[in-house]
A protein has these predicted regions:
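Conserved amphipathic alpha-helical interaction elements at protein-protein interfaces in regulatory
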Residues: 13-17, 48, 57, 61, ...
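A short hydrophobic beta-strand->loop->alpha-helix junction that borders the nucleotide-binding pocket
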Residues: 25-28, 35-43, 83-84, 153-155
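Nucleotide second-messenger and two-component phosphorelay signaling modules
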Residues: 17-31, 63-66, 76, 106-112
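Short glycine/serine/threonine-enriched helix-capping/active-site loop
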Residues: 37, 122, 149
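Nucleotide-binding/hydrolysis machinery
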Residues: 10, 29-32, 90, 108-118, ...
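Conserved AAA+/SF3 P-loop NTPase catalytic/coupling segment centered on the Walker-B
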Residues: 4-10, 41-53, 63-102, 117-121, ...
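Walker A/P-loop
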Residues: 1-32, 36
Length: 221
């Protein structure tokens, strides 16, 4: 709700201009791969299959070889591990090893594959508390957190900069109704928010709640 994936995409989908040795030119346009995965929605086996890939017959239902996200993201790509604190310590050990060695193995295979991309992780929990409770490994934390970004809640943003509401609503309106309708829809939404919710509203649903406000105004126009 605070826009963790938007921040991750902004980092992961950075444009590069790689040099192509075969042609002796720089690529005219290159967009890095971005693979988001919600760790709270997957079992341990399925998580390993999604990230590492698997060989045919590695487990029941593995009918063919499959590349995982660590392999398909390529040299400039990113794997976004959302809700990283939902992983069990056993899975954290395996992910730690990938970060340390830059290598992994598909399920059912012995030959290691090199990981050349980057890992971006996110959580809405207090990592210090998770480590203190023994649910999150300290060694994994220090290997993972090379750079840390805290995404503020919508309430924090608007308390610091009340004028940002119109800008954020216009952004959401553009995505919901298109650029041609964005300005008018944003004006209607801001007017409704000021009349019905007031300037002291704390937005417990964060950006998802703001998006729903814009959609409701669009539906009832």
């Amino acid at each position: 709700g605070t826009g963790k994936e938007l921040v991750a995409r902004a980092i992961g989908l950075s444009r590069f201009i790689p040099y192509e040795e075969k042609t002796g030119r720089f690529a005219s346009d290159f967009l890095a791969a971005f693979h988001p995965i919600n760790l709270s929605a997957l079992s341990e086996t399925l998580l390993e299959s999604e990230l590492f890939g698997h060989a045919k017959g590695a487990f029941t239902g593995a009918l063919q070889n499959r590349k995982g996200y660590f392999e398909t993201c390529g040299m400039h790509g990113s794997v976004f591990l959302d809700e990283i604190t939902e992983t069990k310590p056993e899975a954290q050990v395996k992910l730690l090893r990938v970060l340390q060695t830059r290598r992994f193995q598909r399920l059912g295979e012995v030959q290691p594959t090199r990981f050349e991309g980057k890992v971006i992780a996110a959580t809405n929990r207090d990592l210090a508390e998770e480590m203190k409770a023994g649910r999150f490994r300290e060694d994994f934390y220090y290997r993972l957190c090379a750079n840390r970004i805290t995404t503020p809640s919508l309430d924090e943003i608007l308390r610091d900069s009340p004028g940002e509401l119109k800008h954020l609503v216009e952004f959401v309106a553009g995505r919901v109704a298109g650029l041609d309708e964005a300005s008018a829809l944003a004006d209607e939404t801001c007017d409704w928010i000021n009349r019905k919710l007031g300037s002291d509203y704390t937005w417990p649903g964060n950006f998802r709640e703001l998006q729903q406000c814009v959609r409701n105004i669009l539906i009832h126009r």
